[in-house]
């Protein structure tokens, strides 16, 4: 085998490896070996043993204070917002969000979207529209 043929075989091997590395993620390999999970980002003892609920940035409910009792929650619950996203969004991997995420508006998808997962939204109305007129309305959970 001459050096040019060997070079072509090596380039082809690199191209095949590059193509197949884009089709799979590392999550399947890492999950079987215990690399993710346990003390990872999505557990109650998350990033650095405690930056996610119930020990860190998720509120004061564990310390005896009710969440949003004084109308100081992250999501007010009323309003209108429009977000438009156009184009292809190739996303692969694991996403973990710790803390409070203010979500305002609605999400609308058009077209074919293949997705899996779960979303939980909880809070109280902090805009003065509660049953008492100053943000102490009934809590909601979606």
UniProtKB/Swiss-Prot annotation:
GO MF term list: structural constituent of egg chorion
TM ranges: none
Span of the signal peptide: 1-18
One GO cellular component, as annotated: egg chorion
InterPro entries, per database record: Chorion (IPR002635)
Pfam families the UniProt entry points to: Chorion_1
GO terms for biological process, alphabetical: chorion-containing eggshell formation
Keywords: Repeat, Signal
Domain of life: Eukaryota
Summary of the function given for this chain in its UniProt record: This protein is one of many from the eggshell of the gypsy moth.
Family membership noted in the UniProt record: Belongs to the chorion protein family.
Designated name of the protein: Chorion class A protein Ld12
UniProt source species: Lymantria dispar (Gypsy moth)
